[in-house]
């Protein structure tokens, strides 16, 4: 499929993707070699606890959210990957992700006494949700991931960081992990807060009604997984077995490889096709303006271009 699309292109490949202010995105990033660097239990031999891991993740996330003006809707720290459902209010998603992932990586390396890569080299998978229903499913997907992965029977049992059960507008406080963050740096306050923000979906519902709708969807997902395991005579891993998982080990479950990384999460094929077509047109326009830039001709990159305008001041078009 990728070869066919490459043959259909009339321009050189464009790796850039539009970074649009106000986009609702589900960000997923995996650890290197699928190893359990994000395990809530860390290394018990060094005195690590789930509470310490949750606090480090929460502080790091809250610090980036406040710095880059992101609205966080859901988050879940799994053992070897994590999920963030967010609205990129100001169009700062690349810098936001860099802050989260670089600080998590450095902190985890410091914690475990290692010096190699923490994240997989493929970068994060960022999918845009084009409808209210898809956005709600993103929240439920993140909140219920420990259950759908077969780790715990109920999402509230998960020992890592999770927004499951957080009401919209609820704020929680995290304390600076002084073993990583410099207390003399003014960017690292002793305490920092993180608020779960309601996404701009189902606007006819109040915050409480939308929360109830989300929790009903989460309950449906959890019961479906429990029924599936019961029918297959399988058990969830459980906390005791999770606590024995070594952080340096890798997941043994089956993993699809060499698949195209999705950019749109839509169950409606028409909406998905429309969004993908808009993305193709954007890349074609970007390629044309990139050629103009290389040739020294006047250049105006399409709205949503990020790197060249931010770093080199290349003009960018205004929002349509």
Which sequence ranges carry the predicted segments?
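Short catalytic/metal-binding and nucleic-acid-binding patches
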Residues: 1-320
């Amino acid at each position: 499929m990728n070869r066919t699309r490459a043959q259909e292109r009339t321009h050189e490949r464009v790796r850039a993707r539009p970074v649009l202010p106000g986009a609702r995105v589900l960000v997923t990033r995996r650890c290197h070699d699928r190893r359990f660097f994000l395990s809530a239990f860390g290394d018990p031999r060094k005195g690590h606890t789930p509470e310490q891991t949750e606090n480090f993740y929460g502080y790091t996330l809250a610090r980036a959210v406040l710095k880059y003006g992101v609205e966080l809707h859901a988050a879940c720290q799994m053992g070897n990957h994590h999920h963030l459902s967010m609205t990129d209010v100001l169009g700062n998603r690349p810098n936001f992700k860099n802050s989260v992932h670089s600080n998590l990586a450095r902190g985890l390396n410091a914690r475990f006494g290692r010096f190699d890569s923490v994240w997989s080299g493929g970068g994060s998978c960022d999918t845009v949700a084009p409808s209210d229903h898809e956005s709600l499913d993103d929240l439920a997907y993140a909140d219920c991931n420990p259950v759908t992965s077969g780790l715990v029977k109920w999402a509230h049992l998960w020992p890592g960081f999770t927004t499951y059960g957080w009401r919209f507008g609820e704020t929680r406080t995290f304390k600076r992990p002084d073993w990583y963050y410099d207390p003399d740096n003014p960017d690292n306050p002793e305490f920092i807060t993180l608020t779960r923000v309601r996404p701009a979906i189902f606007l006819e519902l109040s915050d409480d009604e939308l929360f109830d709708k989300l929790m009903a969807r989460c309950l449906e997902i959890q019961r479906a997984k429990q029924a599936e395991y019961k029918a297959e005579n399988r058990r969830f891993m459980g906390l005791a077995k999770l606590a024995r998982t070594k952080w340096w080990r890798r997941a043994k479950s089956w993993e699809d490889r060499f698949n195209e990384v999705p950019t749109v999460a839509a169950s409606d094929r028409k909406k998905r096709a429309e969004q993908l077509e808009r993305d193709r047109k954007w890349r074609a326009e970007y390629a044309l303006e990139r050629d103009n830039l290389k040739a020294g001709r006047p250049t105006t990159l399409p709205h949503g271009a990020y790197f060249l305008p931010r770093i080199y001041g290349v003009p960018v078009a205004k929002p349509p």
